[in-house]
């Protein structure tokens, strides 16, 4: 069993790198990749760790980069990157706009937009969060959920889960909650170039979760046809069998590599388990043999 999409406390996960390795060993995972958001700092910790004493599988160096595409934010995965080089490239890009400052800005903007919708929130100064690691949108959503009165003021899919709130509404230019982040993140081309410069392979993750996309297959093909993509995440925690089958067939047709991952975040997405997602995710090891 493998899991190539995992987050730790180096970004927005709740497991430390060591805790993650212990869980991976308990689950008998054969391959893992720590793909923290916009950083490879977790791999710095691994350099100081006797990995063989904790985890007997193999680790593929990875990263997940948020980038802008068509005035929206999407993510790409980088595998087999030089982690030192990747960290250097990310530092250089964000040198004048730290993650902490960006999240503080988004928090203030989103908080005010929610008030315009006449939604109830805790006083801004009383909301406890850490902009160095936490996402402003998740923090706001979690606070909105504390007040049942908000349910009658929010569309059902906005209230139901964070993915709907974030990817359908906060990412929708036609909705009051929209925040244009396109200037704050690298473009898709820039993000791809950084991964390539760090010697890595570029994969497209969770392609069916972008709820603002009206035609997912058209969206996927546009990126595949116009950008130097190496592979696609074909197995993901929320994919249907039909979606996985479509992506596998696309990879075969376009001669792209395949991968899969749970998008594990620990307690921040407590229903998603390492290796198995919602419990039924089974990623065959043989899909990665041609590129590892």
Question: PLM features: what roles do these ranges have?
Answer:
Residues 86-87, 268-270:
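Short acidic/His/Gly/Ser-rich catalytic and metal-binding motifs that mark active-site loops
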Residues 273:
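Surface-exposed, active-site-proximal loop segments in enzymatic domains
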Residues 267, 276, 281-292:
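Mid-to-C-terminal alpha-helical segments outside catalytic/metal-binding sites
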Residues 51-218:
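Extended substrate/RNA-proximal surfaces in nucleic-acid metabolism proteins
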Residues 1-72, 178-269, 289:
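An N-terminally biased module of ancient metal coordination in phosphate/nucleic-acid-related enzymes
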């Amino acid at each position: 069993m493998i899991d190539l999409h995992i987050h730790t406390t180096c970004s927005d996960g709740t497991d430390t790198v060591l805790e993650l390795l212990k869980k991976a060993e308990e689950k008998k995972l054969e391959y893992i990749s720590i793909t923290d958001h916009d950083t490879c700092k977790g791999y710095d910790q691994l350099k100081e760790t006797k990995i063989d004493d904790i985890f007997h599988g193999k680790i593929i160096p990875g990263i997940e980069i948020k980038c802008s595409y068509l005035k929206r934010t999407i993510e790409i995965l980088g595998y087999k990157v030089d982690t030192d080089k990747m960290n250097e490239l990310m530092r250089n890009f964000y040198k004048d706009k730290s993650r902490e400052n960006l999240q503080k800005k988004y928090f203030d903007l989103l908080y005010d937009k929610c008030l315009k919708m006449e939604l109830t929130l805790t006083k801004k100064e009383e909301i406890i969060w850490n902009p160095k690691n936490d996402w402003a949108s998740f923090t706001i959503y979690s606070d909105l959920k504390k007040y049942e009165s908000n349910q009658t003021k929010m569309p059902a899919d906005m209230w139901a889960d964070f993915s709907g709130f974030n990817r359908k509404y906060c990412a929708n230019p036609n909705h009051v909650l929209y925040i244009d982040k396109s200037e704050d993140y690298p473009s898709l081309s820039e993000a791809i170039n950084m991964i390539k410069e760090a010697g890595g392979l570029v994969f497209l993750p969770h392609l069916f979760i972008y709820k603002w996309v009206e035609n997912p297959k058209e969206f996927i093909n546009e990126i595949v046809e116009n950008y130097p993509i190496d592979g696609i995440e074909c197995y993901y925690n929320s994919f249907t069998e039909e979606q996985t089958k479509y992506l596998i067939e696309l990879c075969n047709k376009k001669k792209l590599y395949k991968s899969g991952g749970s998008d594990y975040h620990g307690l921040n997405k407590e229903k998603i388990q390492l290796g198995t997602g919602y419990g039924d995710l089974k990623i065959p090891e043989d899909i990665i043999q041609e590129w590892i």
